[in-house]
Amino acid sequence: AVWGNHGGTMFPDLTNATVAGKPALDLITEDWYVNELIPTVAKRGSAIIQARGHSSAASAANAAIDHIHDWVLGSNGEWATMAVPSDGSYGIPEGLTFGMPVICKDGDYEIVKDLELNQFQKDHIAANIRALEEERAIVDEIIAKA
């Protein structure tokens, strides 16, 4: 799953990921995961802009297509990451739109429940909550002035 906001705090969580039936975290080093993968995913949008010299909109469009595909047609029992209003799970404030693992079926989604989170995961999720709440406060201020 990829938790949180699209941006520098985005957190690719491999805790429950598997590769050919093996836990993904058993196939990589902690150093590579923490110091390479997480920062690379978090900076992906800006890296695309820098490499291509223009917007990463095509990448965002592909993500939107995948998002709608899974939502409408289902994710076949597999987890997908979607930005959805939180129901309060995992300490994410209720109503905050947040990327989290879901399973899609019949045009609906259900947040994956009861995952055990370690402190590393909780810290990254908390950083995303702070970033999104800061963005929401900025928007609220702009709207109040309008």
What are these regions (language model features)?
Residues 1-146:
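Long, compositionally biased stretches enriched for glycine and/or charged residues
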